[in-house]
Swiss-Prot record:
Gene behind this protein: miaA2
Residue segments, region Interaction with substrate tRNA: 38-41
EC main group: transferase
Positions with a binding annotation for substrate: 15-20
Superkingdom of origin: Bacteria
Reactions mediated catalytically: adenosine(37) in tRNA + dimethylallyl diphosphate = N(6)-dimethylallyladenosine(37) in tRNA + diphosphate
Cited NCBIfam families: miaA
Record's keyword terms, sorted: ATP-binding, Magnesium, Nucleotide-binding, Transferase, tRNA processing
Name this polypeptide is given: tRNA dimethylallyltransferase 2
Amino acid sequence: MTMPDYDLIAILGPTASGKTPFAAALAAELNTEIISADSRQIYRGMDLGTGKDLEDYTINGRQIPYHLIDIADPGYKYNVFEYQRDFLTAYETIKQKGCLPVLCGGTGLYLESVLKGYRLIPVPENQELRVRLAEKSLEELTAILSSYKTLHNSTDVDTVKRAIRAIEIEEYYAKTPIEEREFPQLNSLIIGVDIDRELRREKITRRLKQRLDDGMVEEVRRLLAEGIQPDDLIYYGLEYKYLTLYAIGKMTYDEMFTGLETAIHQFAKRQMTWFRGMERRGFTIHWVDASLPMEEKINFVKQKLKEF
């Protein structure tokens, strides 16, 4: 099919919605490449814990090229400013081949940072603010964060450290006039994968059990043995938080499993809250039922491309 006037197709959805196999099948159909929008899959060696599922990028024996996966070492604190830079590099590489890039992921902050069309600026540390917030609980910090109207909110913020950093960024933006930087205004077709809540919960639990069977605990122990500090792994949240606490003896296996399962369910709910927030902020998201056959989902996107 002829390429439309869109600059980008974005496939977004909560964890366990099947967005990656969908994006890969679509990329195969359109003969293009994928740019990941996942804040943790950028780390090398953090595979099971981030749910990379790299086999999803092979369609009928053909490897679909992907970008922004395995680009940083564990322990490094990659940020949204670097993501914007690296996204543009990948985007321009794909466009130079005459292809329509497919952006795929569930990290709302990363998705919105490139779909919004303005460059974010690095925010310095505010030690005074950090001291002031140090004694607050995650719940109190989340309440503070939810009062802000701009890009950051509670998605991807499941540790106190991340919440404080997000508040630090919001405070800086509130007090510092931000001139909008050069960033391409991308005309994006945004497709959301809508999965039934109960089905999503079933898939999350099943997937968690499978990844534990596949060696997710051993992956965390290996990272610790390689010298990654426990606090640095805990910083990444979710699987790495709970599995590290289990690996260093701060939790029993049952406590780890129950706590992690609950945290992933809550995370998926926050992802959907973010995507609904994007719609309120003016983004048009075309939702497709996750349970549809793959061919129907691909045809749904093709139809949207033709409608432009």
